[in-house]
Amino acid sequence: MSMGLEITGTSLAVLGWLCTIVCCALPMWRVSAFIGSSIITAQITWEGLWMNCVVQSTGQMQCKMYDSLLALPQDLQAARALIVVSILLAAFGLLVALVGAQCTNCVQDETAKAKITIVAGVLFLLAAVLTLVPVSWSANTIIRDFYNPLVPEAQKREMGTGLYVGWAAAALQLLGGALLCCSCPPREKYAPTKILYSAPRSTGPGTGTGTAYDRKDYV
């Protein structure tokens, strides 16, 4: 694997990791849907993993942490755990990638470095899946409730910026992890061993063994 490909894969994975952190912190997973009577509202509601915010038409914003975890929808409860695990897993993958990088001297064996880089790629792929699942789950819940006639219009939401950042983070980590997994251990080259065979010779002119070889020698 070339160093350029390794650096590209690591850079994409790190960028995806940073986007996951932004996705986790943004209080914009769900935003108010301006439909029906809510079009003339003077405030916008944002809902994230850790807090919800109310933005007034004057630009004033008030944010409040959630009082109870159990009061959150199931998709946001699961998203909290999965996103945090994804961030920690990607951070560990970054450390593993640095250990197995060709530009570092933590490991001298090239074969071991390639295997360590593959492990880092797998960790980034797992982190991408852990980010993709909760983001897609939340998006599916928002779309389902939006088209559900039983849900009041005031409670309907649209997809916020946090979900799009999460999808971008998952895509970057998938691409970066896949590039790192392309690191194949170098094949060891063995020189073919030459084995020389010598023809047996007879011990004397009268012996029966090796007469064919004796005749060939005298021709």
From Swiss-Prot:
Keywords: Cell junction, Cell membrane, Membrane, Phosphoprotein, Tight junction, Transmembrane, Transmembrane helix. The keyword DNA-binding does not apply. PROSITE patterns: CLAUDIN. The modification Phosphotyrosine is found at Y197. GO terms for molecular function: cell-cell adhesion mediator activity; identical protein binding; structural molecule activity. Residues 1-8, 102-115, 183-219 are cytoplasmic. One of its GO terms (cellular component) is apical junction complex. It is a multi-pass membrane protein. It comes from the Eukaryota. Its main location: other. InterPro entries: Claudin, Claudin3, Claudin_CS, PMP22/EMP/MP20/Claudin. The modification Phosphoserine is found at S198. The chain crosses the membrane at residues 9-29, 81-101, 116-136, 162-182. GO terms for biological process: actin cytoskeleton organization; bicellular tight junction assembly; calcium-independent cell-cell adhesion via plasma membrane cell-adhesion molecules; cell adhesion; cell junction assembly; cell junction maintenance; cell-cell junction maintenance; epithelial cell morphogenesis. Residues 30-80, 137-161 are extracellular. Residues 218-219 are annotated as: Interactions with TJP1, TJP2 and TJP3. It is found in: Cell junction, Tight junction; Cell membrane. The keyword Cell inner membrane does not apply. Belongs to the claudin family. PANTHER family: CLAUDIN. Plays a major role in tight junction-specific obliteration of the intercellular space, through calcium-independent cell-adhesion activity. Can form homo- and heteropolymers with other CLDN. Homopolymers interact with CLDN1 and CLDN2 homopolymers. Interacts in cis (within the same plasma membrane) with CLDN19. Directly interacts with TJP1/ZO-1, TJP2/ZO-2 and TJP3/ZO-3. This is Claudin-3. It comes from Rattus norvegicus.
